[in-house]
Amino acid sequence: MTAHRLFHYSFVSENHPAKTPMSLTPRRTPPTVPRRGPRRPVMPAPAALPTRIVPAMIRRTAACLRLIAALALSAGLAACAARAPTPSATARARIVTDGYFRIAASPAPRETIGLPYRDWLPPGRPRAVVLALHGFEDSRNAWSTLGPVLAAHGIAVYAPDQRGFGAAPGRGRWPGTATLVSDARQMAAILHRRDPFIPLTLMGESMGGAIAIIVAAAGDPAISSYVAIAPAVWGAATFPLPLHWVVAAAGTLAPRLRLTGRSLHLRLSDNLAALRALAADPLTLHAAPLGMLAGMVRMMGAAQRDCARLAAPRVLLMYGGHDDVIPPHATAACWRAIPRGARATLAWYPADDHLMLLDHERRTPIGDILSFLRHKRRPLPSAAATDAMIFLAEH
C-alpha cells in the first residue's frame, strides 16, 4: 500500500478521466400521477426487514468498498489491462538493485525471468536469512527500514520485487496467486541451496503476508519459520452480499478502469514523511487497473481459508490496532481458525497502523520480529501476545 492511499479514490478510465470523485447519490423518482378508479390494496412491507436495516446495509457496504479501494486490490484479466510504465530513477529517488533471482517463467518453465532484489547483509556469515515479500503496489524498498536493523543483528535480508510490481517483469499486470506463490517457493529454494544449514524465514507484509500464509499452510522444507505482518486475509466469505457482486463484475465490466488516490481518509501510518517517500518512489505502482480487483480478492480468500491449515514449524502473525485496511473481524476470523497445537504466535499492537514497520511506534514490532528470529522458544519481549488475547475477546 502506498502513500497516495491517504487520499480519496475516484474512478477514472484511460480515455475519459473524471474530474470529480464518483459519489453515490439517491435516485430521484418522478412524481406519480394519481389514477382514476378504485384503489388497490397496498401490500404491507415484510416485518422481517425493518426499514432501518437498509441504511445500515448501505453503510457497511460503502465501508467495505472504501477499504477495497484503499488496498487497490489487483488481479484478473491481465491481458485487458494496460501496461504500467517502466520505472526510472529520479534525482530524488534512485533505484538500488543488488542482484536478481533467476526463476522459471511460468507457464513456460524452460524460460527464466529475473526478479530484482535489494539485500541487507551482516559483515560475516549470517545467523539467519529472511526472504521478505512486499505488499500490493509496493516494491523491494518496503523493507528499507527493517532490513538494516536485522542485518546489524546478524540476519541477512533479501527483498525482491515480486512479479507485476516494482521493476519486475509484468509490471502493472496481475500474475495470479499460483504464480506469486510459486515464485516465492523458487526464491526460497535458491536461498536455501546457498547454505542449507542457515534457518530461512519467509516474511511478508499485507499481500506478502497472505502469500506467506498460503505457503505456510502447504509447508515448504526449505523454510524454517514465517512472519506475516498485517496479512491480507479479508476473504470474500466475510464480505457483505452486495460486495460479492462488485467483485464479480469489476474485472469483467471495467478492466481498464483505474483507481487513483484522492481524499480517502484512511491512515496507513502515522509517519507522513515515510508515506510521502513511498509515493515518490519510482518503483511504486500507482493507479492499478480495477480489473485486477477480482484476483487479489481471491488471494485474500485463499489466505483466509489457509489460516485453518497452518501447520508450519513456527509462525508469527502481527496486526495493528489502527489498521484501516484489513478489518478486525477478518483478522480475528483468521486467528480463530488456526488449529490447536499449531506453533503460531499471535501479536496485536494497539498503537500501530497497517504499515507498522513505518510507524513512529515501529520499535516494538521490530523488536518482536528480531526476538522471534533469534530465539525459537523465547516469548515475545513485548505485551503483544497478551494483547492478542484481548483483541480476540473483543472481536
Task: Please identify what each model-predicted range represents.
Residues I58, A72-P109, L115-P122, A393-H395:
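An N-terminal hydrophobic leader/cap segment in hydrolases
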Residues R127-G135:
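Short beta-strand element of the alpha/beta-hydrolase
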Residues E205-P289:
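Alpha/beta-hydrolase-fold enzymes
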Residues P327-A337:
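Short alpha-helix in the alpha/beta-hydrolase fold that links the catalytic acid
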Residues A351-H395:
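Catalytic active-site module of serine/aspartate enzymes centered on a nucleophile-bearing elbow/loop
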